[in-house]
């Protein structure tokens, strides 16, 4: 078998996720990207509650009601000879653990920034996660059709707060009502903006050359002079694009535009397919696996319940790392040691499923899961190794959960353990009593859990406040010291959904004192799946 077609398929894959603060325009940009990839015909801007026109990528019932993207969905589309896999990440205040983990399955990220607001809190947190693997970052400065902050100032803020150099690729011509387009620094072209064309791909008028008198005629003498002055400053003060620095996560190419007006998104996509890496190598506990390895390997980074309300199923999302998936192939689930035939893997267009005949490195496929697959599971063609770097994050918010009907304790526990396996929430059972504590990274996760317990497990649960401030997974090599630690701290110990011992601290002060008191015990903020 000639290897050339396989190598070609690997080389043309680009797998990325979008990170942003809520309401920076992530869902809108997702829509426009799909429009350019011809995955959808018209972009249905995400409407508020009660509207029946919903964004293609927000499909779970609760998302439809709230107009937010709760679950990570996956969309694949062709663009300029490349095949792009876009992993949509929840952008709302919460759902962050899912979002964090999704970032472990991509080779590149697009950071969307609201240019009127600059760097916001959630963007900071997500960027921290991308730093764990030095993921390459592209930046899109959004909402230029509104009044924005000085673009130079916003770029400086990104550089100082997120510790990444910025290299502007395009530069805005005016903003708000005076927004006239963008100038491309490397092509020496100005693209002129027309408002009201956001739902389709517009024919853009291009003016070649910064000194072209046509430019003055198109945007006015004053704005043209301002643009030339700004660009002189920008070219003197900012970084030039350097692909190696980009691939090492040290420098981000910056694009300007308006996702709502569908302007500038294509420049970013062009940059993505031209500069972003094809599928990258991944570490396992035994060796590094490269995408062009002949044998199939992949890991599960997310489990999604009820993608199909008609069937009560769960789907495990698997990132293909190496080799080629073919329908009906036998794979080993390393954690259980079982060999399974995968005949019905799925590919996605957010909620629209289609069965996949083959998949290549960089692709995301869905495996039907009846409770046997967990986050972090590695699948191979027989090799016993495990991919590393798929973390669990210590929750920051806690509630005690209890039943309205005490007879349904068994269903409650089953529901919570399953929801924790798919990463919707973490569950802790204190060692010294029968409480059930739910831990999350954001408040909205609590609502999701109660709603899903009701609809999927027929359990009515309510929350109560609990005096827990943070949690850490604990371990210790010295058995004797660990026994003593457990004996003296029983009241603060719990088991998580995977039966891992956890220290539950009522306050940060308590945690710090306990850590000082037991230097041999390791307190972990993240735990490998």
From Swiss-Prot:
Point out the signal peptide segment: none
The molecular function terms of the Gene Ontology recorded here are: GTP binding; GTPase activity; guanosine tetraphosphate binding; translation release factor activity, codon nonspecific; translation release factor activity, codon specific
Record flagged with keyword Magnesium: no
GO terms for CC? Answer: cytosol
Q: Which PROSITE patterns match?
A: G_TR_1 (PS00301), G_TR_2 (PS51722)
- Indicate the segments forming the tr-type G domain, all copies: 11-280
| Chief localisation class | cytoplasm
Q: Which UniProt keyword terms apply here?
A: Cytoplasm, GTP-binding, Nucleotide-binding, Protein biosynthesis
Q: What function does the entry list?
A: Increases the formation of ribosomal termination complexes and stimulates activities of RF-1 and RF-2. It binds guanine nucleotides and has strong preference for UGA stop codons. It may interact directly with the ribosome. The stimulation of RF-1 and RF-2 is significantly reduced by GTP and GDP, but not by GMP.
Name of the protein: Peptide chain release factor 3
Species of provenance: Erwinia tasmaniensis (strain DSM 17950 / CFBP 7177 / CIP 109463 / NCPPB 4357 / Et1/99)
Originating gene: prfC
């Amino acid at each position: 078998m000639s290897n050339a077609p396989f190598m070609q398929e690997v080389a043309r894959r680009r797998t990325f996720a979008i990170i942003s603060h809520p309401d920076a325009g992530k869902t809108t940009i997702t829509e426009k990207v799909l429009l350019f990839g011809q995955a959808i015909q018209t972009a249905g801007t995400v409407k508020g509650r009660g509207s029946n026109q919903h964004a293609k990528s927000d499909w779970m019932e609760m998302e439809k009601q709230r107009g937010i993207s709760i679950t990570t969905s996956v969309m694949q589309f062709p663009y300029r000879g490349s095949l792009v896999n876009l992993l949509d990440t929840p952008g709302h205040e919460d759902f962050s653990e899912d979002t964090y983990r999704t970032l472990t399955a991509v080779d590149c990220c697009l950071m969307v920034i609201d240019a009127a607001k600059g760097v916001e809190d959630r963007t900071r947190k997500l960027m921290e996660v991308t730093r764990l693997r030095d993921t390459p970052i592209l930046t899109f400065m959004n909402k230029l059709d509104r009044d924005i902050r000085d673009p130079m100032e916003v770029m400086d803020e990104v550089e100082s707060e997120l510790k990444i150099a910025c290299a502007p690729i395009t530069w805005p011509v005016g903003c708000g009502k005076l927004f006239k387009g963008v100038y491309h620094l490397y092509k020496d072209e100005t693209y002129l903006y027309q408002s009201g064309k956001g739902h389709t791909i517009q024919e853009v008028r291009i003016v070649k050359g910064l000194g072209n008198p046509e430019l003055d005629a198109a945007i006015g003498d004053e704005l043209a002079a301002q643009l030339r002055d700004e660009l002189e400053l920008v070219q003197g003060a900012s970084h030039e694009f350097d692909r190696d620095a980009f691939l090492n996560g040290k420098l981000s190419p910056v694009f300007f535009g308006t996702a709502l007006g569908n302007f500038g998104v294509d420049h970013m996509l062009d940059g993505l397919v031209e500069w972003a890496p094809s599928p990258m190598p991944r570490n396992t506990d035994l060796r590094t696996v490269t995408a062009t390895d002949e044998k199939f390997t992949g890991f599960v980074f997310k489990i999604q319940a009820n993608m199909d309300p008609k069937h009560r199923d769960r789907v495990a999302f698997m990132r293909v790392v190496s080799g080629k998936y073919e329908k009906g192939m036998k794979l080993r689930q390393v954690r259980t040691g079982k060999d399974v035939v995968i005949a019905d893997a799925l590919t996605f267009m957010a909620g629209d499923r289609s069965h996949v005949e083959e998949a290549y490195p960089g692709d995301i496929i869905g495996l039907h899961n009846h409770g046997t697959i967990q986050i972090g599971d590695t699948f191979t063609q027989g090799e016993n190794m495990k991919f590393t770097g798929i973390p669990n994050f210590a929750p920051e918010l806690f509630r005690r959960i209890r039943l309205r009907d005490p007879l349904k304790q068994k269903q409650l526990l089953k529901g919570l353990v399953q929801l924790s396996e798919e990463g919707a929430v973490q569950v802790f059972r204190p060692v010294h009593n029968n409480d059930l504590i739910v831990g999350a990274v954001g408040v909205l996760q609590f609502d999701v859990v109660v709603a899903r317990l009701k609809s999927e497990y027929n359990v009515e649960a309510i929350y109560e406040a609990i005096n827990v401030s943070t949690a850490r997974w604990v371990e210790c090599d010295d058995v004797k010291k660990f026994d003593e630690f457990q004996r003296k701290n029983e009241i603060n110990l719990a088991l998580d959904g995977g039966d891992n011992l956890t220290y539950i601290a009522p306050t940060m002060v308590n945690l710090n004192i306990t850590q000082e008191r037991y230097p041999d015990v390791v307190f972990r903020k993240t735990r490998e799946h």
